[in-house]
């Protein structure tokens, strides 16, 4: 999902996760329509990784406890993780390549590690849909690329949930994201295959500025006036 600030991304996410009701139209998620199914049950199948969740986790929470909390939809557990919860949390940490960080407090995890742990939290909850709301915010270029490569590996696993990436940056769009929604001023500007949507023409319209999009090896780059571009 792409769009400038104020394009409607946050409002749409709030609708998708059941926290905001639209004034018109309908919302269908995972084959079920809000209003015709219990949204509380449907929301349990949707995971969200965002900066707001990161900020609510206390510094002394261990990575394994953060992950285990996904099973019970809670934050900042006061009890140790044991038994089947521990087994499931360790498996999820291994899947997000953070098994060696299980006993590390939240305060001592890097931003990239925190993002992986939160994805592990979503995996242990067995969400069918995982929304990543600007997951690379705050990461330096190296950490961002490492996180994106991890995300690409995760997307190819058999147990991976459906993924939605919300971003401002075309550099973060991986080949695994085959469909793209572009918003502009609260309306849908484009909805379809990523290769046809992430183009100079579409993004120039979305950001109301002349932009140049380049594509190489399945990845995208964005430039301003004067950069050579391909794909539209």
Task: Pin down the residues of each PLM region.
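Conserved ABC ATPase "signature" region
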Residues: 83-101
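Conserved ABC ATPase signature
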Residues: 105-109
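Helix-to-loop junction immediately C-terminal to a conserved catalytic motif
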Residues: 17
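ABC ATPase nucleotide-binding domains
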Residues: 201-232
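The feature captures the beta-strand-to-loop junction immediately N-terminal to the Walker
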Residues: 2-4
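Catalytic Walker B motif of ABC-type/P-loop ATPase nucleotide-binding domains
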Residues: 130-134
């Amino acid at each position: 999902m792409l769009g400038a600030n104020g394009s409607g991304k946050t409002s749409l996410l709030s609708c998708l996760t059941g926290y905001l009701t639209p004034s018109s139209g309908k919302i269908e998620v995972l084959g079920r329509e809000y209003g015709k199914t219990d949204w509380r049950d449907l929301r349990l199948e949707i995971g969200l990784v965002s900066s707001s969740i990161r900020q609510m986790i206390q510094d002394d929470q261990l990575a394994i406890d953060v992950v285990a909390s996904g099973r019970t939809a809670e934050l900042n557990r006061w009890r140790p993780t044991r038994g089947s919860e521990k087994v499931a949390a360790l498996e999820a940490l291994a899947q997000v390549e953070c098994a060696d960080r299980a006993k590390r407090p939240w305060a001592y995890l890097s931003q990239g590690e925190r993002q992986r742990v939160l994805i592990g939290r979503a995996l242990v909850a067995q969400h069918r849909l995982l929304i990543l709301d600007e997951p690379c915010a705050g990461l330096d270029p190296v950490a961002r690329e490492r996180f994106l490569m991890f995300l690409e590996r995760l997307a190819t696993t058999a147990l991976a949930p459906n993924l939605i990436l919300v971003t401002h940056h075309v550099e973060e769009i991986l080949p695994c994201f085959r469909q793209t929604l572009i918003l502009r001023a609260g309306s849908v500007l484009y909805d379809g295959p990523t290769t046809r949507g992430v183009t100079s023409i579409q993004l120039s319209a979305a950001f109301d500025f002349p932009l140049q999009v380049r594509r190489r090896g399945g990845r995208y780059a964005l430039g301003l006036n004067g950069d050579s571009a391909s794909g539209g």
